[in-house]
């Protein structure tokens, strides 16, 4: 597992009169501070970083290096936060995610299912624009003046909340042909199970 939140976890443990390093040593599972502390040849690691602004591609590459050593295969879930009331940061994260998906799709083997989707859509909309001005002209001032995260500039609007339209699901690898059209999100679970060669239990009858 790789993620952020070390300061918050450390503070919460301190309130409970506990120490993160002591707890991790007692459990026999060190909580590492950065990627460089992952030992060569490791097959698993727990890395808790100080900040959420880490290199996503490095995190995925290091994780794939560990998990792909398992001859029985692996499951890796990558979550990336693009729901933010900081518009420029959110757009930058979308670009990062797009590049990471493309690179990871080239790295994994043909026997690996790569599945991409979102848990919800987000109310960030391009609503026009004119030739000449930059797309995000006026953004910083609009964010400073925005009530409760509502941003309005010439080319863009953002209401900091979820929206109700369908989200994209895309895939490559074994079972990718089953991903398309309108699907229930629970059907993606069955696609993943089938890629393992397992059969999911039938759904419970609706009452």
Question: How would you describe each model-predicted region?
Answer:
Residues 1-206:
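A post-motif C-terminal structural segment
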């Amino acid at each position: 597992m790789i993620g952020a939140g070390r300061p918050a976890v450390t503070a919460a443990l301190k309130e409970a009169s506990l120490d993160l390093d002591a707890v991790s040593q007692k459990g026999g599972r060190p909580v590492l501070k950065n990627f460089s502390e992952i030992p060569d040849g490791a097959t698993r690691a727990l890395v808790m970083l100080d900040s959420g602004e880490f290199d996503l591609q490095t995190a995925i590459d290091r994780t794939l290096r560990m998990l792909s050593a398992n001859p029985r295969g692996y499951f890796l879930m990558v979550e990336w936060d693009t729901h933010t009331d900081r518009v420029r940061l959110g757009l930058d994260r979308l670009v990062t995610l797009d590049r990471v998906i493309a690179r990871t799709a080239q790295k994994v083997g043909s026997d690996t299912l790569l599945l991409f989707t979102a848990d919800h859509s987000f109310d960030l909309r391009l609503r026009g624009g004119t030739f000449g001005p930059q797309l995000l002209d006026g953004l910083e001032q609009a964010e400073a003046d925005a009530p409760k995260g509502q941003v309005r500039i010439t080319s863009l609007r953002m209401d900091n909340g979820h929206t109700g339209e369908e989200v994209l699901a895309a895939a490559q690898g074994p079972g990718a042909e089953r991903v398309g059209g309108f699907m229930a999100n629970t059907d993606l679970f069955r696609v993943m199970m089938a890629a393992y060669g397992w059969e999911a239990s039938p759904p419970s009858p609706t009452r």
